[in-house]
């Protein structure tokens, strides 16, 4: 959902939320974003025509949204009633030495539950609105919590989601159901997937981050040395394009098995660039995953690979 916030009509409200110093200020800024998010989600539900829709909550660190241009900083300070000096201090406080492993994903919702509350409200209200217009469509929102590494972490965020969603659904007099799941992208989440499945109704294996955290190198920096690894036959392929079945794949298989032990009907899939790689799709089919998610231009390849894997399985 984070890509929705960068457009001009919404980045200001997002920045107001980030530099807010009280929950009241944050909620005021989030109230500006909620109808915008709802409209976006309604458009998604309309485009999908009743097909399953999974919406991931805010994932990246907040510093990615704050202004860096002095003119933008001065403008935001004026709108917020702050001095430029104070706003610069707030922006500096958001700096992280390792943002990939920092204050992002579900950690944002633990720190600022009002973010999860706003996004949940937008998701549920959008689904109810489209459902009222399209009664023949079976719309069951799937809300995905990113970067979970601990069962209690997901339980906390899920409690915020449930409280918000149930209230809206009850007030609407609706019988609509929804699902809450998580991304498995931290090795600890894969290792404790049986516990996490007590709270999660579905897993989506975020193979981009899971690969980074399992290998211990950043996708953004790995280009500096991976070529040498290919030349010396240490790695035969880019682990960010083709799933490393021996390491990352083993974690995925383990987590899938553990998740099914706790919740036999759990929905399992992967999302990431590897989802468009034929060998990765075949591996996912083999271990019982039910779907892959990938960038649009990789979809035809993924669909073909899924069909080939299914045919091979029948032979």
Language model: regions and residue ranges:
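Conserved alpha/beta-domain cores
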Residues: 1-315
């Amino acid at each position: 959902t984070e890509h929705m916030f960068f457009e001009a009509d919404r980045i200001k409200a997002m920045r107001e939320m980030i530099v807010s110093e009280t929950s009241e200020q944050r909620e005021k800024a989030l109230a500006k974003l909620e109808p915008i998010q709802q409209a976006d989600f309604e458009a998604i539900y309309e485009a999908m025509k009743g097909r399953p829709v999974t919406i991931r909550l805010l994932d990246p660190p907040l510093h990615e949204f704050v202004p860096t241009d002095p003119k933008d900083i001065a403008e935001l300070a004026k709108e917020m009633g702050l001095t430029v000096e104070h706003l610069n201090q707030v922006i500096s406080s958001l700096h992280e030495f390792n943002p990939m492993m920092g204050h992002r994903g579900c950690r944002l919702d633990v720190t600022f539950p009002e973010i999860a509350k706003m996004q949940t409200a937008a998701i549920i209200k959008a689904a109810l609105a489209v459902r009222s217009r399209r009664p023949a469509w079976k719309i069951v929102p799937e809300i995905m919590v990113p970067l979970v590494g601990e069962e209690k972490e997901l339980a906390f965020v899920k409690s915020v989601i449930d409280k918000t969603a149930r209230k809206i659904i009850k007030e609407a007099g609706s019988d609509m159901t929804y699902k809450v799941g998580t991304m498995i992208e931290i090795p600890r989440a894969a290792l404790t997937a049986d516990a996490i499945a007590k709270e999660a109704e579905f897993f989506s294996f975020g193979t981009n981050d899971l690969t980074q955290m399992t290998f211990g190198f950043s996708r953004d920096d790995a280009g500096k040395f991976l070529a040498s690894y290919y030349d010396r036959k240490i790695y035969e392929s880019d682990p960010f394009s083709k799933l490393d079945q021996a390491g990352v794949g083993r974690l995925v298989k383990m987590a899938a098995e553990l998740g099914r032990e706790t919740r036999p009907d759990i929905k399992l899939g992967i999302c990431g660039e590897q989802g468009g790689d034929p060998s990765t799709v075949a591996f996912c089919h083999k271990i019982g995953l039910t779907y892959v998610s990938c960038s649009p231009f990789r979809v035809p390849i993924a669909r073909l690979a899924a069909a080939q894997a299914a045919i091979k399985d029948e032979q």
